[in-house]
Amino acid sequence: MDSSSSSSAAGLGAVDPQLQHFIEVETQKQRFQQLVHQMTELCWEKCMDKPGPKLDSRAEACFVNCVERFIDTSQFILNRLEQTQKSKPVFSESLSD
Amino acid sequence: MEGGFGSDFGGSGSGKLDPGLIMEQVKVQIAVANAQELLQRMTDKCFRKCIGKPGGSLDNSEQPGRPGAGVRAVPGAAKSRAEPCAPPLPQKCIAMCMDRYMDAWNTVSRAYNSRLQRERANM
């Protein structure tokens, strides 16, 4: 990627490419953080019974599985939505069925 | 690296806007926001785990899952009820809960990171 060429930020005028890169990196980092917050909250409900003096191995395994299954679920939903959108678009005029 | 930035970044009026400074400030704000988010969710979860029926003070609040315990007036009596995982005072429960929540958060963060790296490797 040629960062010394004219700015790739279409319509934004002369945006500093260094700042642009910074924004992209930080945005991605934030996306990660947000998902960690969300998954921790969800998995806490599933994996934590009574908080003890330390996180026992069963609870820890549960958290790991929970993360994996959450990502699986998310991917499944995206894939299936993509498929059903091809055959029968959801977000279109013909919503009534 | 030629570029258009420099002293003309925002030069009208007093002071120039230093992109480096802006980036540092943004990083700090992001970190603060994340800490607040963590605190908010942790407080929610630990309140649910440790405070059942709220009493007149933190000491006098029941922990959930102990029906008929009533308002805790005598901590000693509660101990003799031999519940190995329920600490005598909500504060101890909350403290443990906080530590466990941090453990959970770190575990989730690691697991998610591993999964992302695995996905990238498979592309």
Swiss-Prot record, chain A:
BP terms from Gene Ontology: nervous system development; protein insertion into mitochondrial inner membrane
Membrane disposition: Peripheral membrane protein
Subcellular location: Mitochondrion inner membrane
Origin superkingdom: Eukaryota
Tissue expression per record: Highly expressed in fetal and adult brain, followed by fetal lung, liver and kidney. Also expressed in heart, placenta, lung, liver, kidney, pancreas, skeletal muscle and heart.
InterPro entries membership: Tim10-like, Tim10-like_dom_sf
GO function terms (MF aspect): identical protein binding; metal ion binding
UniProt keyword annotations, A-Z: Chaperone, Deafness, Disease variant, Disulfide bond, Dystonia, Membrane, Metal-binding, Mitochondrion, Mitochondrion inner membrane, Phosphoprotein, Protein transport, Translocation, Transport, Zinc
Disulfide partners: C43-C66, C47-C62
Family: Belongs to the small Tim family.
Disease in which the protein is involved: Mohr-Tranebjaerg syndrome: An X-linked recessive disorder characterized by postlingual sensorineural deafness with onset in early childhood, dystonia, spasticity, dysphagia, mental deterioration, paranoia and cortical blindness.
Cited function: Mitochondrial intermembrane chaperone that participates in the import and insertion of some multi-pass transmembrane proteins into the mitochondrial inner membrane. Also required for the transfer of beta-barrel precursors from the TOM complex to the sorting and assembly machinery (SAM complex) of the outer membrane. Acts as a chaperone-like protein that protects the hydrophobic precursors from aggregation and guide them through the mitochondrial intermembrane space.
Protein name in UniProt: Mitochondrial import inner membrane translocase subunit Tim8 A
Organism: Homo sapiens (Human)
Gene name in the database record: TIMM8A
